[in-house]
């Protein structure tokens, strides 16, 4: 819901189990309108939508997306942020380190994140100044990162995703940011680790050059775009 001064408070749907889009949709219909009626009756109600890779692929189908957008309009709901952290099963199973896989070394994580951004661009209201965000894993589970090549693979995929977000912004007019979420026992666990990874790798010269070539930007614009589209959530 809108708090004023451009701030939004959302109801995070990852509290409810649901791995398929059918399960997620049923949960939304059962719970969210009732919660909105109690929390902010007569006002728009923001949702932080959690989608697994499987659910995201289903929602990306035009008929499914059109039906969901109609549901949002009918109940005065809007989506401005997505939880793209758990790729697969999140409820009803022992997740532990498996929740971080596939991680940012892999094409699967990149494709999943691109799909989420595409969906959010179609769901995000056209309100002036409203930007979308997608949360994601903090790179990888720390024990899985053993070599410089692992770090380089994460860097390259994050830069590729930034290029996707730049292109998406040009096409849709929607600004979306990917937010890595530091957690214990992960590659990004502390502020110092995050500052080092972003400063030395994500925002480094190689990343600027890659994004400039990928997105047709000058070096200064590419450096700014990396900072505009890649960050942290705490």
Question: Across the structure, where does each feature detected by a protein language model lie?
Answer:
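N-terminal pre-domain/capping segments
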Residues: 1-132, 153-163, 227-230
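Active-site acidic/histidine proton-transfer and metal-coordination neighborhood
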Residues: 93-227
């Amino acid at each position: 819901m809108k708090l004023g001064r451009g701030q939004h408070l959302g109801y995070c749907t990852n509290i409810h189990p649901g791995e398929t889009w059918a399960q997620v949709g049923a949960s939304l219909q059962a719970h969210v309108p009732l919660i909105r009626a109690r929390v902010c009756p007569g006002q728009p109600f923001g949702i932080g939508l959690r989608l697994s890779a499987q659910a995201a692929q289903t929602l990306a189908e035009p008929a499914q997306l059109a039906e969901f957008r109609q549901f949002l309009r009918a109940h005065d709901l809007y989506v401005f942020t997505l939880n793209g952290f758990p790729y697969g099963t999140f409820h009803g199973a022992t997740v532990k380190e498996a929740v971080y896989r596939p991680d940012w070394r892999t094409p699967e994580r990149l494709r999943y994140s691109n799909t989420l951004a595409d969906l959010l661009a179609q769901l995000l209201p056209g309100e002036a100044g409203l930007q979308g965000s997608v949360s994601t894993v903090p790179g990888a589970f720390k024990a899985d990162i053993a070599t410089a090549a692992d770090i380089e693979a994460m860097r390259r995929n994050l830069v590729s995703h930034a290029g996707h977000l730049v292109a998406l912004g040009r096409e849709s007019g929607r600004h979306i940011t990917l937010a890595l979420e530091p957690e214990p026992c992960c590659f990004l666990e502390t502020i110092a680790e995050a500052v080092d990874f972003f400063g030395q790798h994500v925002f480094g010269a190689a990343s600027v050059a890659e994004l400039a070539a990928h997105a047709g930007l000058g070096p200064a614009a590419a450096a700014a775009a990396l900072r505009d589209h890649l960050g942290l959530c705490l």
